[in-house]
Amino acid sequence: MPTDQKVDYLELPASDFDAVQSFYEKAFNWKFTDYGPDYRAFNDGKIDGGFYKSENCSSAENGAALIILYADDLEQTKENVINSGGKILKDIFSFPRS
């Protein structure tokens, strides 16, 4: 897969790093590095990124970016999300390229 001009690093706002880290570790097995009170980096095995401290977090419904995560087993991933404290806002649906 070409890597030129592909998303290389992703930064997202978060108001509660511990909750964000706990959720993504449990639901998706992401690895985290703590860089102090204002930043927490992650790696999911394919992309690196981080969460920066912000009290002004938004949702896709309010104009924030919609990020699609790939999963081989959608039903199992849905169960992992729920068991990790996440909420399903839109159930599994057909998506272009999926």
State each model region's role.
Residues 1-21, 48, 65-67:
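N-terminal beta-strand motif that seeds the catalytic metal site of vicinal oxygen chelate
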Residues 14, 44, 94:
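Conserved strand-loop elements at the edges of beta-sheets that form or border functional pockets
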Residues 23-24, 81:
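Conserved active-site tyrosine of GNAT-family acetyltransferases
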Residues 30-62:
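Conserved short beta-strand elements that form part of the metal-binding/catalytic scaffold
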Residues 68-98:
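Vicinal oxygen chelate
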